[in-house]
């Protein structure tokens, strides 16, 4: 403490006398420089005396560390030995004689002198230790403190070696224990969990912060393994196998999988259900594609594109036709109730592929499905922006209005006479392409007629009872339909009719004559004629039945002129019948 006080006092005096940043020659000129040099000499003597004391008191404990620590001091004191400090030099040489360290210092100058080619009493590499010596001179107390601390550590090691050995032994054995646990339980899926629970019971603080992370990892891997191997093997046919696995874990109260249940259940259900619907749709679409490609005429290439829009529901049109005639009077009374019902999933209809079985068993089911689809789609229809899905669902509604034309004997006779006329093929094809460009729903209805004709050709013997039943239904419903159309026409004359509704009526009236071609032809010869001449005659009938299809057919529907009678195809229906068709179509659109 006295040395530190003297040093601080000298520094303060120097700063006061010479300034904070003294010039390089000011230290030599200042009177305090002599006092500082004396302080440094006294510090060095103290260090040497303290080291000798330590060696004499406990030589066995200090020797291993004293060798490593005192080499710079010995080198520095050898340097000062040439400076004229004789007493210090004798003490240091006596200490070197006791240590074997002095032999190393005697050998070093000879080798380095040979390398350098100089024979100097103070070799050049030893000059590198001079800045360390200056640091020691500047901070002698720190040096002494470090030496005392190391001596105390040596004493502690000698006093309690058993604790240190146990600590080192535990640190060495920790990785081995981990390896043993992991090697034993690689096949077992809960090995790390068991090891962690043992460490928690023992209170091992080092592994506690890893517990949650490792537990979640192990449970996720365990769940993925079980989901990959046993879940797929046992429950390939069952859709809810993974859900059963999760419920078993919940019953066992496995806390590790608790936070994963909801997420995985939602993912699995979302992944399982849409795949079923997609597979059913793909099957029905593939079968319908094969039937269409085998039996379509090659003259009309654009029909294949439009037929893909109405694939799903054209499979079931045969039985739906009969049901629609039955339910037409019942629909208009119950539209307000059924508008707010939810649509049944569309996957119900594609699964029912056999029209024969539908006629016998599934009449009531198809009634409900068809009525809900018709009324919901008519309520939600936008006449200018019709998506393909709505077009495919509105086909049944277009068929519904086919019952109006059954009450008209003139339309029936003309529709039967159309395929028999000797019409040229080139204007018919031009008409079909123009109508396809104008509205895609026309080609959908052509595809409907083709599929119905194919079904009739396949059924063969079942055609006659169906056609007879349809004739009876048409006769029964003709009177009711005329009355309802008159009543609804009065209501619609009061309400303003926009151009968009009239244009949708045209597209919806164009499907009127298509069912008559097939359902009224009970003879198989006439059926074959209708199936052969059907695409051409149906396009002409569609273009001729609506108003405004005569002159500007190349233009879109929004720009068609209204009020001109059709001149192509020879269909000369009266204006009153066409007005009645228009008004029934308006009713459906408004409802």
Swiss-Prot record:
A motif (Nuclear localization signal) lies at residues 579-583. Keywords: ATP-binding, Cell membrane, Cytoplasm, Developmental protein, Differentiation, Lipoprotein, Membrane, Methylation, Nucleotide-binding, Nucleus, Palmitate, Phosphoprotein, Prenylation, Repeat. It comes from the Eukaryota. A lipid is attached at residue 588 (S-farnesyl cysteine). Residues 306-317, 349-383 have a biased composition (Basic and acidic residues). Sequence repeats lie at residues 171-174, 183-186, 224-227, 234-237. It is a lipid-anchor. One of its GO terms (biological process) is cell differentiation. Changing residue 588 to S: Abolishes membrane association. Residues 282-293, 385-413, 528-542, 559-575 have a biased composition (Polar residues). The keyword Transferase does not apply. Belongs to the paralemmin family. This is Paralemmin-3. It comes from Xenopus laevis. The gene is palm3.
């Amino acid at each position: 403490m006295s040395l530190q006080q003297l040093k601080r006092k000298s520094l303060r005096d120097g700063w006061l006398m010479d300034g904070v940043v003294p010039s390089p020659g000011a230290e030599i000129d200042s009177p305090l420089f002599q006092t500082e040099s004396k302080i440094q000499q006294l510090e060095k003597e103290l260090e040497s005396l303290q080291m000798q004391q330590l060696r004499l008191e406990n030589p066995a404990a200090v020797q291993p560390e004293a060798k490593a620590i005192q080499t710079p001091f010995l080198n520095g004191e050898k340097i000062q030995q040439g400076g004229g400090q004789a007493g210090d030099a004798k003490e240091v040489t006596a200490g070197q004689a006791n240590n074997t360290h002095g032999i190393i210092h005697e050998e070093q100058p000879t080798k380095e002198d040979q390398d350098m080619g100089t024979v100097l009493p103070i070799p050049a590499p030893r000059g590198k230790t001079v800045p360390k010596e200056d640091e020691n001179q500047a901070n002698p107390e720190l040096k002494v403190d470090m030496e005392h601390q190391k001596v105390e550590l040596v004493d502690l090691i000698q006093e309690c070696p058993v604790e240190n050995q146990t600590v080192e032994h535990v640190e060495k054995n920790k990785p081995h224990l981990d390896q043993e646990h992991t090697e034993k339980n690689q096949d077992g899926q809960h090995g790390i969990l068991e090891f962690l629970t043992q460490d928690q019971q023992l209170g091992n603080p080092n592994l506690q912060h890893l517990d949650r992370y490792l537990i979640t990892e192990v449970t996720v891997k365990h769940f993925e393994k079980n989901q990959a191997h046993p879940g797929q093997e046992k429950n390939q046919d069952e859709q809810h196998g993974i859900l059963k696995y999760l419920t078993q874990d919940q019953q066992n109260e496995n806390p590790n999988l608790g936070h994963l249940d909801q997420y995985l259940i939602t993912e699995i259900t979302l992944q399982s259900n849409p795949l079923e619907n997609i597979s059913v749709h793909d099957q029905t679409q593939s079968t319908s594609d094969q039937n269409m490609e085998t039996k379509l005429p090659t003259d009309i290439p654009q029909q294949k594109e439009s037929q893909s829009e109405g694939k799903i529901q054209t499979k079931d049109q045969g039985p739906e036709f009969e049901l629609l005639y039955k339910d037409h009077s019942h629909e208009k009374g119950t539209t307000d109730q059924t508008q707010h019902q939810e649509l049944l999933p569309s996957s119900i209809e594609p699964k029912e592929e056999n029209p024969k079985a539908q006629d016998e068993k599934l009449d009531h089911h198809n009634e409900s499905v068809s009525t809900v689809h018709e009324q919901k789609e008519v309520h939600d229809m936008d006449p200018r922006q019709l998506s393909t899905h709505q077009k495919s669902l509105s086909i049944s509604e277009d068929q519904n209005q086919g019952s109006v034309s059954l009450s008209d004997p003139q339309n029936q006779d003309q529709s039967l006479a159309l395929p028999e006329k000797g019409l040229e093929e080139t204007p018919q094809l031009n008409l079909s392409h123009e109508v396809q460009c104008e509205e895609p729903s026309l080609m959908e209805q052509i595809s409907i007629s083709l599929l119905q004709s194919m079904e009739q050709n396949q059924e063969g013997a079942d055609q006659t009872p169906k056609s007879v039943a349809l004739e009876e239904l048409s006769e029964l419903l003709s009177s009711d339909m005329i009355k309802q159309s008159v009543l609804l026409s009065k209501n619609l004359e009061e309400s303003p009719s926009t151009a968009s509704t009239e244009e949708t009526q045209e597209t919806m009236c164009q499907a009127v004559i298509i069912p008559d071609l097939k359902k009224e032809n009970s003879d198989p010869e006439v059926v074959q004629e209708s199936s052969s001449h059907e695409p051409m005659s149906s396009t002409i009938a569609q273009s001729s039945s609506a108003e405004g299809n005569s002159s500007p057919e190349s233009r879109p529907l929004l720009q068609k002129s209204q009020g001109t009678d059709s001149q192509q195809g020879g269909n000369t229906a009266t204006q009153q019948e066409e007005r009645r068709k228009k008004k029934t179509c308006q009713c459906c659109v408004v409802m």
